[in-house]
């Protein structure tokens, strides 16, 4: 039986001809039988693809041959081509859609002026060092707010954002001005959103900004469920969520009955389809699989 895997990676580097990279990446994935999503811009690449293990290995090896992609940090997880509906390779103004394509500065070394990178072990050392000095490290979630319903760092601030486009308005709202003189650690799934978010925060006067290198994925690989992370990790494919060990807590609650759950379901209203947490029992009927307070759509 063939082994299958999913890889997640990104790379910030100047790309002079994004469309040429798009054509190359599509041809490579089609040749290897891979599916997934790849976004390319003048600032780099953001990819999640899956397929047969040897094919994925060849894909990673070939992708790293591109000058700007030599040092990409690839995260591996269980899954395969069947976890994605198709192969999508597109050129966009941004590889993460914050709505600020002109603000991000990128050079051959990556994002210019972003937060200080912290490996998982360095994060723990920072927390301990600040604690000894009577300071508290603030964890700042760089994902869409709903993702944090099933997993987040302990006591993290979860901004009220439906998409990454909402972050700039949220940062400029004044809600977080009290954090501008505090040590703030941004985190997200694989690290890419925090590359941009941390630079946006620095540009708006946050003085001590860090970003979790490799994101929640790398942290979970390192500490499983024995560290500062609680719950499951939301992922944007058919798996919907993943856990780092059998000891993972279930912190999500069914919107109907408050039973523990980590499973998101789409609202059964075809014109709505909002993702909401439901337990297995409440998700079993179209009548209960509706937004409890009425659909927004």
UniProtKB/Swiss-Prot annotation:
What EC number(s) are associated with this protein in UniProt? 1.14.-.-
Catalytic activity, per the record?
uridine(34) in tRNA + AH2 + O2 = 5-hydroxyuridine(34) in tRNA + A + H2O
Q: Where is the Rhodanese domain?
A: 133-228
**EC class:** oxidoreductase
Q: Name one GO molecular function term.
A: oxidoreductase activity, acting on paired donors, with incorporation or reduction of molecular oxygen
Q: Which UniProt keywords apply?
A: Oxidoreductase, tRNA processing
Q: Superkingdom, according to UniProt?
A: Bacteria
Q: Tell me a GO biological process for this protein.
A: tRNA modification
Transmembrane helix as UniProt keyword? no
Q: Which PROSITE patterns match?
A: RHODANESE_3
Please report which protein family the annotation says this sequence is part of: Belongs to the TrhO family.
NCBIfam families per UniProt:
PRK00142.1-2 (NF001134)
Q: What does this protein do?
A: Catalyzes oxygen-dependent 5-hydroxyuridine (ho5U) modification at position 34 in tRNAs.
What this protein is called in its record is tRNA uridine(34) hydroxylase
């Amino acid at each position: 039986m063939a082994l299958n895997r999913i890889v997640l990676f990104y790379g910030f580097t100047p790309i002079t001809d994004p469309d040429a990279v798009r054509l190359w990446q599509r041809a490579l994935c089609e040749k290897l039988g891979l599916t997934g999503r790849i976004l390319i811009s003048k600032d780099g690449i953001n990819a999640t693809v899956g397929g047969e293990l040897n094919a994925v290995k060849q894909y990673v090896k070939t992708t790293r041959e591109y000058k700007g992609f030599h040092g990409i940090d690839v995260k591996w997880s269980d899954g395969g081509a069947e976890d994605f509906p198709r192969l999508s390779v597109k050129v966009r103004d941004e590889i993460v859609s914050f709505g600020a394509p002109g603000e991000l500065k990128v050079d051959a070394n990556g994002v210019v002026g972003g937060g200080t990178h912290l490996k998982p072990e360095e994060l723990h050392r920072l927390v301990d060092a600040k604690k000894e000095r009577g300071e508290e490290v603030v964890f700042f979630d760089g994902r869409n707010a709903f993702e944090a319903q099933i997993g987040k760092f302990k006591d993290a601030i979860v901004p009220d954002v439906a998409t990454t486009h909402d972050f700039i308005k949220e940062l400029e709202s004044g809600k977080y001005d009290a954090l501008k003189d505090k040590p703030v650690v941004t985190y997200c799934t694989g690290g890419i959103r925090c590359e941009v978010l941390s630079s946006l925060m620095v540009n708006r006067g946050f003085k001590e900004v860090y970003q979790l290198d490799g994101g929640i994925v790398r942290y979970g690989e390192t500490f499983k469920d024995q560290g500062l992370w609680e719950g499951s990790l939301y992922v944007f494919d058919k798996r919907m969520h993943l856990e780092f060990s059998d000891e993972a807590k279930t912190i999500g609650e069914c919107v109907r009955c408050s039973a523990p759950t980590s499973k998101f379901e789409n609202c059964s209203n075809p014109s709505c389809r909002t993702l909401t947490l439901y337990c297995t029992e409440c998700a079993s009927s179209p009548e209960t699989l509706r937004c409890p307070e009425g659909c927004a759509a």
